[in-house]
């Protein structure tokens, strides 16, 4: 399936239906009063997060979405039917942005979440509404109020527990393929991975979701190599696994380049828990391995794990280290949620 994580679409809610002009007509009632009903309300534009989707590719082929108009009012004081809603089904993790691409209108983070983006117009009044003591046979009605319309952007930010970051050809896709059933494209040249990939990883009796994004380059925070869109896919992760290619000449420069891009991108990426790993150690001599590990540790100012996605060396240890960070993050999130709930529950009521 092709991957699309950003698109622009046009939305319009339904116009309200017109009110009716009608008069009561029954046997033995010669001059029945007005009984024209109101028009129906126009359909809403609704966005819904659904399970089983991980791309916005459907919105490449259809960019205009319009809800139906409300039904006409009818005699005997019957209101028109409500217009049919336009429901946009999107993957979990989709954000709806205003035309400026900055203002977030909706953030779809849970399966089944539904948000009304545009409300349908109200139905018009039928002539029964205008009946009065001085106007007993009105022929007035209103046509219904127009619906809302706007252009919006849909932006998908994948939801994963852990994210893989690193320069192109750092071995991220090889690692993902080694620990999950994901099958990203793998080759011995930079920029093999051009779209994000998700894999479900089994660590003991627990599972977590790992995201592999295309390799970052210098200037990614400014959009070079579509870097800003790729970085958005690791915004929601709980921990980052930073892979550094051990066969590179300068592992310190490789590490600092990615850290700089994370810091300049913002969004809290630079503050996320980070595990640093020297990858492709199967291609290094013992002397090269120790030399580069020491260099990388000096730049990262933290322990450096050793890894080879190709041979499996260090993979299991890495999975349980990732799981440990994920557990800690989940625990902190649960405590924060409990604290918020406690404050709401015991907040003083203002009279």
From Swiss-Prot:
InterPro entries: G_OBG (IPR031167), GTP-bd (IPR006073), GTP-bd_Obg/CgtA (IPR014100), GTP1-OBG_CS (IPR006074), GTP1_OBG_dom (IPR006169), GTP1_OBG_dom_sf (IPR036726), OBG_GTPase (IPR045086), P-loop_NTPase (IPR027417). One of its GO terms (biological process) is ribosome biogenesis. GO terms for cellular component: cytoplasm. It comes from the Bacteria. GO terms for molecular function: GTP binding; GTPase activity; magnesium ion binding. Residues 1-159 form the Obg domain. It is found in: Cytoplasm. Keywords: Cytoplasm, GTP-binding, Hydrolase, Magnesium, Metal-binding, Nucleotide-binding. Its cofactor is Mg(2+). Its EC number is 3.6.5.-. The keyword Methyltransferase does not apply. Mg(2+) binds at residues 173, 193. It holds the Pfam family MMR_HSR1. Its main location: cytoplasm. GTP binds at residues 166-173, 191-195, 212-215, 279-282, 308-310. Monomer. HAMAP family: GTPase_Obg. Belongs to the TRAFAC class OBG-HflX-like GTPase superfamily. OBG GTPase family. PANTHER family: DEVELOPMENTALLY REGULATED GTP-BINDING PROTEIN-RELATED, MITOCHONDRIAL RIBOSOME-ASSOCIATED GTPASE 2. This is GTPase Obg.
């Amino acid at each position: 399936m092709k991957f699309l994580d950003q698109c622009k679409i046009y939305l319009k809610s339904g116009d309200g239906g017109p009110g009716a002009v009608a008069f009561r007509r029954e046997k033995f009632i010669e001059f029945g009063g007005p009984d024209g009903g109101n028009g129906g309300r126009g359909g809403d534009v609704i966005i819904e997060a659904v399970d089983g989707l991980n791309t916005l590719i459907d919105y490449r082929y259809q960019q205009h979405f319009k809800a139906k108009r409300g039904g006409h009012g009818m005699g005997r004081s019957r209101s028109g039917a409500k217009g049919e809603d336009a429901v946009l089904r999107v993957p979990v993790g989709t954000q709806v942005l205003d035309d400026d691409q900055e203002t977030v209108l909706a953030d779809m983070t849970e399966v089944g979440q539904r948000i009304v983006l545009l409300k349908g117009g109200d139905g018009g009044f039928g002539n029964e509404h205008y009946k009065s003591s001085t106007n007993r046979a009105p022929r007035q009605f209103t046509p219904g109020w127009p619906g809302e319309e706007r252009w919006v952007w849909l932006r998908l930010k994948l939801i994963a527990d852990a994210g893989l970051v690193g320069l192109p050809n750092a071995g991220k896709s090889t690692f993902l393929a080694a620990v999950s059933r994901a099958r990203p494209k793998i080759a011995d040249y930079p920029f093999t991975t051009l779209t994000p990939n998700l894999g479900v990883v089994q660590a003991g009796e627990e599972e977590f979701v790992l995201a592999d994004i295309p390799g970052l380059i210098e200037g990614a925070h400014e959009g070079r190599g579509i870097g800003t869109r790729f970085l958005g896919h690791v915004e929601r992760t709980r921990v980052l696994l930073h892979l550094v290619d051990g066969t590179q000449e300068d592992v310190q420069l490789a590490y600092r380049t990615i850290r700089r891009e994370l810091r300049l991108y913002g969004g809290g990426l630079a503050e996320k828990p980070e595990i640093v790993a020297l990858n492709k150690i199967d291609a290094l001599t013992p002397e090269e391995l120790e030399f580069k590990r020491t260099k990388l540790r000096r730049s990262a100012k933290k322990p450096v794990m050793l890894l080879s996605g190709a041979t499996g060396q260090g993979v299991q240890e890495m999975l349980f280290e990732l799981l440990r960070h994920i557990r800690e993050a989940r625990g902190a999130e649960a405590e924060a949620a409990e604290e918020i709930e406690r404050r709401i529950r015991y907040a003083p009521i203002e009279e």
